[in-house]
Amino acid sequence: MKKVCIIGASGFTGGELLRLLLSHSGVEVVCATSRKFKGEFVYRVHPNLRGFTQLKFVEPTIDAALKADVVFLALPHGESVKWVPKLYESGVAVFDLSADFRLKDPNAYVEWYKWPQPHPYPDLLQKAVYGQPELHRDELVGAKLVAVPGCMATASILMLAPLAKYGQLGEVPPVVDAKIGSSGAGAEGSIVDLHSYRTYVVRPYEPVHHRHIAEIEQELSRLAGRRVRVAFTPHAVDIVRGIFTTGHVYLDKLPAEADMWKYYRSMYGDSKFIRIVKDRLGISRYPNVKYVLGSNVVDVGFELDPRLNRVVTFAAIDNLVRGASGQAVQAFNVAMGFPEDEGLRQIPVAPI
């Protein structure tokens, strides 16, 4: 039984970590922290957990965290870096849901996250494992510092990874269009995340130089064995949960459909969570956010456009589960030797 502490447990990702870990047979959640709600029952902030836990929020301190074997950091970007060195040195396993240890290049934090100087712990950057089990499984086994991938980066990488691995990304940078629900803005969003502004909306934000580009390019370049650049634009849409990504890959020669199936099946055929969705019949012939919600499932798919020598790829995920807390638990399971789907066997909710 692993004792777990969640630092920053009052937000959406913290609440999802609690929901998933409370059903994990190998975990005891011994602390959940929040400065704002210190002393309050967890279910007062996360009403869906009423009747499932009597845990109260405590002040976030290193001493509280060290009562656990494993710490999940659900903190804003730029905050985890203050915690990780002390926790890592103490021998506690750390699963960081922020971006603070995702990028291997210390200078990338200046460019993509506007840090005033390069990452102060380049040695820990190299030790951190990028927590995408389908692509980093061997590295995750026994890992003590795991950087959980970003939500839109997760969908983008997983839909394009088979093409990167098998040399099918071409010389033209792939174009990725992403759509994300309002929960992606967190529990304390800005004025444009209020209901009056968000309802009926379909709007781009950070249409160029979005920070998730750094992760996407890092991981696709690793798979391709060369530098890969990506054109990425996200859009806020009128849903609460979910991310849908569409990728456009332009090639000199289009692969056969049978080869495309081989690429995707070779990478994901044994996956517990990734489903390849490309059907000729049924009501959902390609990935659809509606059919992954509440789960750690990733639906990926593709279509071929011979007129333009274009491969169109798709991915659908729940941004709070597979895009954050679910992927963190999945990586935790692989690192700690639990069944990969322990605590993650929720079937997607439909209709919703």
Curated annotation (Swiss-Prot):
Catalysed reactions listed for this entry: [amino-group carrier protein]-C-terminal-N-(1-carboxy-5-oxopentan-1-yl)-L-glutamine + phosphate + NADP(+) = [amino-group carrier protein]-C-terminal-N-(1-carboxy-5-phosphooxy-5-oxopentan-1-yl)-L-glutamine + NADPH + H(+); [amino-group carrier protein]-C-terminal-gamma-(L-glutamyl-5-semialdehyde)-L-glutamate + phosphate + NADP(+) = [amino-group carrier protein]-C-terminal-gamma-(5-phospho-L-glutamyl)-L-glutamate + NADPH + H(+)
Q: Which UniProt keywords apply?
A: Amino-acid biosynthesis, Arginine biosynthesis, Cytoplasm, Lysine biosynthesis, NADP, Oxidoreductase
**In its UniProt record, which GO terms are filed under biological process?**
arginine biosynthetic process via ornithine; L-arginine biosynthetic process; lysine biosynthetic process via aminoadipic acid
Which pathway or pathways does this protein act in? Amino-acid biosynthesis; L-lysine biosynthesis via AAA pathway; L-lysine from L-alpha-aminoadipate (Thermus route): step 3/5; Amino-acid biosynthesis; L-arginine biosynthesis
Keyword NADP present in the record's keywords: the answer is: yes
Q: Where in the cell is it found?
A: Cytoplasm
Q: Where does NADP(+) bind?
A: 10-13, 34-36, 319
EC number of the protein:
1.2.1.103, 1.2.1.106
- The keyword Cytoplasm is assigned to this record: yes
Gene3D superfamilies in alphabetical order: Dihydrodipicolinate Reductase, domain 2 (3.30.360.10), NAD(P)-binding Rossmann-like Domain (3.40.50.720)
**Family annotation (InterPro entries):** AGPR_type-1, LysY, NAD(P)-bd_dom_sf, NAGSA_dehydrogenase, Semialdehyde_DH_NAD-bd
What is the top EC class of this enzyme, as a single word? Answer: oxidoreductase
| One Gene Ontology cellular component annotation held by this UniProt entry | cytoplasm
Q: Which residues form the active site?
A: 151
Q: Which GO terms describe its molecular function?
A: N-acetyl-gamma-aminoadipyl-phosphate reductase activity; N-acetyl-gamma-glutamyl-phosphate reductase activity; NAD binding; NADP+ binding
User: Which HAMAP family does the record associate with it?
Assistant: ArgC_type1, LysY
Q: What does this protein do?
A: Involved in both the arginine and lysine biosynthetic pathways.
Protein family per UniProt: Belongs to the NAGSA dehydrogenase family. Type 1 subfamily. LysY sub-subfamily.
What name appears for this protein in its UniProt entry?
Putative [LysW]-L-2-aminoadipate/[LysW]-L-glutamate phosphate reductase
> Organism, per UniProt?
Pyrobaculum neutrophilum (strain DSM 2338 / JCM 9278 / NBRC 100436 / V24Sta)
Lineage here is:
Archaea, Thermoproteota, Thermoprotei, Thermoproteales, Thermoproteaceae
Q: Which gene encodes it?
A: lysY
